[in-house]
Amino acid sequence: MLAFRKARRKLRMGTICSPNPSGTKTASEVCNADWMASLPAHLHNVPLSNLAIPGSHDSFSYWVDEKSPVGPDQTQAVIRLARISLVKKLMKKWSVTQNLTFREQLEAGIRYFDLRVSSKPGDTDQEIYFIHGLFGIKVWDGLMEIDAFLTQHPQEIIFLDFNHFYAMDESHHKCLVLRIQEAFGNKLCPACSVESMTLRSLWEKKYQVLIFYHCPFYKQYPFLWPGKKIPAPWANTTSVQKLILFLETTLSERAPRGAFHVSQAILTPRVKTIARGLVGGLKNTLVHRNLPAILDWVKTQKPGAMGVNIITSDFVDLIDFATTVIELNDLLEDRALTKC
């Protein structure tokens, strides 16, 4: 029965976003653009905090500018070292954690975005940029790309988690929040009870965007959710075994109500990791060989009040990450049918 439902769900949402001459589907070509709209009706009333939702780590880092100044998120030692042009090229290999653009991630099924932002030295127009060691695209450009997708897919809901701010004073925050408001308008969902956030309740009000803002500035705007409503425990390890143990432990400690929960299924390089794999970069040195084990862990999980909710990964296109997370929701379907 479960196999039949999975096949049916793939017919509904597993279409191809772009043709592949070989006839096979890579992870980046499987299109889950409308997976939320395609969930069975009884899941429309399940709180989003109880669904399995795929997300990406450092979601914006598919492009970073090696010609820009080093970001204020780096130490003074790194900033001084980066005066050597080769250093920035190497930094780029370790700053990029995604291959897909926002649009491509959305089409692949990603619905949670991990965002770090900063002002840029020398800019006088208060423009805000994404940042991960090096500066990425303008936040405004990213927001517009996301909004264009949402307009075309009115039943898809996204989480934008602004969790790190660098070199930003109150005027920068005001500028950023006004940009968010201008980009999404009536799609913005006001902060309220987490348990009341279901697909049906959001669809009825035409809300599509939940903004989490890890800064006291959130109190000034009703559509900014406090960061404490979406905890994302960080393992900070290069060991996949330690990562999985950490994920299991933090899930067991998850609050059953009042917050979403992010399981960061990511490995973090240490200085010696970078030194050993300097030229290879993050993807080739640490991520690629460990992703299969991480995906195997994901496959063993169940969503629900005490189960997984949002799961994030680096390089979400390298494996069938998003589809694997989405299909965990079939387990909620199983439970519902068992009770009938």
Curated annotation (Swiss-Prot):
It is found in: Nucleus. Expressed at highest levels in brain, followed by stomach and small intestine. Detected at low levels in kidney, ey, thymus and slkeletal muscle. PROSITE patterns: PIPLC_X_DOMAIN. The active site is at 57, 132. GO terms for biological process: lipid catabolic process; signal transduction. Its main location: nucleus. One of its GO terms (cellular component) is nucleus. It comes from the Eukaryota. It catalyses: a 1,2-diacyl-sn-glycero-3-phospho-(1D-myo-inositol) + H2O = 1D-myo-inositol 1-phosphate + a 1,2-diacyl-sn-glycerol + H(+). Keywords: Hydrolase, Lipid degradation, Lipid metabolism, Nucleus, Transducer. One of its GO terms (molecular function) is phosphoric diester hydrolase activity. Residues 42-215 form the PI-PLC X-box domain. Catalyzes the hydrolysis of inositol from phosphatidylinositol (1,2-diacyl-sn-glycero-3-phospho-(1D-myo-inositol), PI). Could also hydrolyze various multi-phosphorylated derivatives of PI, such as phosphatidylinositol-4,5 bisphosphate (PIP2), releasing inositol-1,4,5-trisphosphate (IP3) and the protein kinase C activator diacylglycerol (DAG), therefore mediating cell signaling. This is PI-PLC X domain-containing protein 2.
